[in-house]
Amino acid sequence: MRINYCENGCMLYYKDYIDLESCKFCQRAHFRKAPSGKKVDVKAMHYLPLIPRLKRLYASNRSAPHMRWHHENRRPPGVMCHPSDGEAWKHFDRKYPEFAAEPRNIRLGLCSDGFTPYSVSAAPYSCWPVYLTPYNLPPEMCMTSPYIFLNCIIPGPLNPKIMIDVYFQPLIDELNQLWIERVETFDVSLKQNFNLWAVLMWTISDFFAYGMLSGWMKTGKLACPYCMENTKSFTLKHGQKNCWFDCHRRFLPMDHEFRNMKNEFRNNTVDRDCPPPIYTREQVWERAQHFPKVTEEQPYKFDGYGVAHNWTKQSIFWELSYWKDHLLRHNLDPMHTEKNYFDNLFNTVMDVNDKTKDNIKARMDLPEYCR
């Protein structure tokens, strides 16, 4: 499925706007004239519909019997080998028992990240594929190539940043259809029709994409999406980088010995602070709903950005009526977390040229904050 979009990534020429001659935000032309005189679209993205592929999972004997695995193969308490063992899955079951009553209803995870499709020496080009995975399947099938569905490719050459929501509109429409209207599907393993219900459980990304998807930008002192404005981060005097050193003692029990150590963490500092409040799902939605969507307004910096909050938009995922009821909406993938940590540690210990964190400015900052 080919969908035209604005040259600047402001909007899709989709649904009510399919016949517009120019972008409703920046007024860039929808079409250009080819040498033959024919009108040609300026930019287009490719979208692969989700619903037909979900229905095909039940049309094949290779996958249909396994789509009930999460329900039929229960693990003992305390054993976790599948997302269905997690509290977020169980919380959703308790919140929507009618959905949980039909084990064939599908739960999905969304993953996206940017990559450069050309050689490193070529001109910079950022391309963003979006993948969806059904979690009904057993672990040995869940993350294999046949069941990781490419949903769309957000073309480059520029990073979409917070405008990534523009390209998610067809997906959100399908997810709403799967939740509100449901889709009649034939289950070949049980030889019967049923109304398929599907839910997007969470997103998985690196920290930068987390900010693009959630609407809480991951830059500056307020980068942490849990501490929010209650963070204890500070800016290094010489390195001028945001630092979260010694921000974690506040999470320890009040009588923990680390809290009273004056010189083992920040110099001459004890920590008597309580952990930051954990906002409920309702409180997060109460904050997010006051910000506009990038599909409705051009983005701009809101009052207090970087000081009182880091909101850049209302994420398009809030259009899913169940999104506010999720216990866990966004996840960090372990590959980026582990690799980045290891790279920094290894390069510093081994003093890798141009990659070590042990530089002159770091040496100047050490006596400022450490004994």
PLM segments and residue spans:
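Domain-level cores of phosphate- or acyl-group-handling catalytic modules
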Residues: M1-R371
